[in-house]
Amino acid sequence: MSEIKDVIVQGLWKNNSALVQLLGLCPLLAVTSTATNALGLGLATTLVLTLTNLTISTLRHWTPAEIRIPIYVMIIASVVSAVQMLINAYAFGLYQSLGIFIPLIVTNCIVVGRAEAFAAKKGPALSALDGFSIGMGATCAMCVLGSLREIIGNGTLFDGADALLGSWAKVLRVEIFHTDSPFLLAMLPPGAFIGLGLMLAGKYLIDERMKKRRTEAAAERALPNGETGNV
């Protein structure tokens, strides 16, 4: 159970692919102009990570070490092609919006990295969980950045959600404030870089505060009974 918890925590927070490893920045910065696009690409990446980790882990004993990377890439490309066809069939609007970034998941360092670092060494169940956790960590980072950029740039949230989730999702669209013209800085790549920088700074501050609290708690536990540590 502790190993399962560690895999989940590492994927979602401690070893977050976007905020710690800084992998997959090209789609992270290019696609997150809206929360809907960010959610769509994040879920596609999560599905690819989960399925490829599961497949590679299952086949790890039959994969020659000398040609493992080409085999990994072929497996990843097959899964990405299947996911691309699913999005094309059931969410065509999102498919048009994401464009080239769906097939580019094949070259995403996150997917190949987890295959080499985790799936090739661990069992199928734990590898699938690792892929799901890493994918959801990236999805959360994308959605936060996409939401911030959409709110600041257009004053809306989940605009076009029906392209991803169907016609019922039109009710998810929220107009936070009305604007006659979008704030282009937030919608263009410079805004993405600024937003990502703020998210990195925020995570650092949270980690430092949590570290300080753990240190203070450990110091209090180390004191003899009745002492508070105050002079």
Curated annotation (Swiss-Prot):
InterPro entries: NqrDE/RnfAE, RnfE
Subcellular locations according to the entry: Cell inner membrane
Class of this enzyme: translocase
Membrane topology: Multi-pass membrane protein
Bilayer-crossing regions: 18-38, 39-59, 63-83, 86-106, 125-145, 182-202
Cellular component annotations (GO), alphabetically ordered: plasma membrane
Keyword Cytoplasm: no
EC number: 7.-.-.-
HAMAP family named in the record: RsxE_RnfE
Subunit architecture: The complex is composed of six subunits: RsxA, RsxB, RsxC, RsxD, RsxE and RsxG.
Family: Belongs to the NqrDE/RnfAE family.
Designated name of the protein: Ion-translocating oxidoreductase complex subunit E
Native species: Escherichia coli (strain SMS-3-5 / SECEC)
